[in-house]
From Swiss-Prot:
One of its GO terms (biological process) is cell wall organization. This is N-acetylmuramoyl-L-alanine amidase LytC. PANTHER family: N-ACETYLMURAMOYL-L-ALANINE AMIDASE LYTC (PTHR30032:SF1), N-ACETYLMURAMOYL-L-ALANINE AMIDASE-RELATED (PTHR30032). Its main location: secreted.
Amino acid sequence: MRSYIKVLTMCFLGLILFVPTALADNSVKRVGGSNRYGTAVQISKQMYSTASTAVIVGGSSYADAISAAPLAYQKNAPLLYTNSDKLSYETKTRLKEMQTKNVIIVGGTPAVSSNTANQIKSLGISIKRIAGSNRYDTAARVAKAMGATSKAVILNGFLYADAPAVIPYAAKNGYPILFTNKTSINSATTSVIKDKGISSTVVVGGTGSISNTVYNKLPSPTRISGSNRYELAANIVQKLNLSTSTVYVSNGFSYPDSIAGATLAAKKKQSLILTNGENLSTGARKIIGSKNMSNFMIIGNTPAVSTKVANQLKNPVVGETIFIDPGHGDQDSGAIGNGLLEKEVNLDIAKRVNTKLNASGALPVLSRSNDTFYSLQERVNKAASAQADLFLSIHANANDSSSPNGSETYYDTTYQAANSKRLAEQIQPKLAANLGTRDRGVKTAAFYVIKYSKMPSVLVETAFITNASDASKLKQAVYKDKAAQAIHDGTVSYYR
């Protein structure tokens, strides 16, 4: 983009828009143990110093654990796990610490053996077992042991990932969790719905989990679904309007951790979302951004939920939708000089910014990812359609003379003037420092994409293509990466 084009009226109007208070990193804590038994124990310590009653399920009996979770909440009891044939050491120790007098075992002897039950009894603890002939029957019997209610949550009894996010809702409202399969309703479920006078149901999962045929047979059903387990969990939080002042985060494939963690979320009257263990899932990012979540408790130690995910949650850019617009494209090459086409430099740097922001937990969106042309208005429209929180326009500079050099960042005063200025002020010094270029400062100009974009917006001029020294840097991957790092770091600093 040529400098003489940029000789536009510079706007030095008073900036009256609100500048957000500087933010700190998000709060991230973690609770976990060396295994599923230890993690459940550590979770219980977040809720109880003593507990007269505890609920115990088999460590691999996920359906039993799901149906038991609302019962545990209602009994003011922790949910603990055990090995099938021997009382787990961690659980045994915890029962003693809590001075527990009564244990409710949920599940039959294949899940928690008679020998294990006897080991619990030997601690001077009274035992009650709730068990049915199958998971449907066990869930129905748990429902009967709970208080009166007219609503139930319905899940596919084999799709465990559908359950954790809805457990806090079911538990705190006293709703039992009942099971069905995709194409039919088990007789035990039908009977308990009738016996308890259930008149409305929340059906969790799409038609791949519970068919419309089953759905239509349930009393006054409402369905919550998602394209995957992460989106489903996010949709549960969104549609049920669960509290998010503290959000519990668990690996979507670590069912024991997720279910036990959900009981903690229920006790604290908060919500739980799911993530991939190695990288914060898109579904989690979206709900974090839309709900402005900033306090997190991770369920499970590494590797269940990696340090990378913890760092993403901590980063204030997490969940923010950042629109990245590499200028020019296709027939519009932009500036040309020293063997460089501006459109190619812009795209290279933009892709690097995209990668870095994605790694930090943001939701970056590129206006183009290849040599494609979009009009300026199309770029503005794309950012609006993406509901972007920020707009980053990336360019390289040029002049008729080869002398001008350096880096500069522009903002416009039409919309979000103060916030745009602040964003530019965070990016510009980092850009000049990283590239070792002349710092030409932060300036105002009515460039189309930043003038007509309604979110905070900046146009970054990385360096001059027409200057030999600047161009030599724009030819090198290491410097293009440094430019991208500066734009990333400035964006993160804006949120701090």
